[in-house]
Amino acid sequence: MEEKEEKKVNTEELKNEASTTVNQVKDTIKNVDIKKDSIETKGFIAELFKDPLGKIKEIVDKENNQYFKYAIIILVIWVVAELISRCFSVGPIWGLSSLGSSLMSVIKATIAPICSILVMSIIVLVMNSKNKKSLTTIITTVTTANIPLVIASVVSILTIFGSSISTITIPFTRLCSAVSIVLMYFTLKSIFGEEKNSEFIKKFALVELVYYIAYIVFSLLNIYI
């Protein structure tokens, strides 16, 4: 009986968080000043690279709406980068069936970054029962940890000028992926409020396991998160 009540509470909590997040995204988009906020986002990224762990901890502790705005801008950049890359990678289109297939491929590649952030954020929200944080804060920190991957996606656009450039972009993407994993580890450690690596590493492994199960499910739909 208690277990059913707990599941019910968790479900309601998840619904409330989702509703709050959607409303906050709408408000954030309405209040975006593209020029001003773009400059501030650049400064935010620069500060992150100067002191990544300190900046991540600051985001988790302060739960500042301004950081959420930066995260939205960063995510939009990621989506646009993937959109450009996919549009140029689509081959010649012959007939309506090819058009539909190519269009679907572009859409799936474009929504992949959003799905990636949301999946990881929801997993963390559900598994983090002791040190509760809002979904918007989790989305902000998870997006921040993925900034190296965003940079890699932007750099990968260069391959539209020639496939030989991939000899540079592929190793760079791998490097960015490794940096992102390290940032994600310390991001989740800060969210979970763990001090000792020996205690947190098991939780991190479990979070990653659940994420990669989700990855397999999404990949069956040709969405690679």
Give the predicted meaning of each segment:
Residues 1-43:
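Low-complexity, intrinsically disordered extramembrane tails and loops of integral membrane proteins
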Residues 31, 58, 89-93, 128-132, ...:
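Perimembrane helix-loop junctions in membrane proteins
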Residues 34-136:
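Selected alpha-helical membrane-embedding segments in polytopic membrane proteins
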Residues 74-78, 145, 176, 208-211:
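Hydrophobic alpha-helical transmembrane segments of polytopic
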Residues 80-89, 115, 119-127, 151-159, ...:
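Alpha-helical membrane-inserting segments
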Residues 107-121, 145-153, 176-181:
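Generic alpha-helical transmembrane segments
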Residues 138-152, 206-209:
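Transmembrane alpha-helical segments of multi-pass membrane proteins
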Residues 156-225:
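Terminal transmembrane helical module of multi-pass membrane proteins
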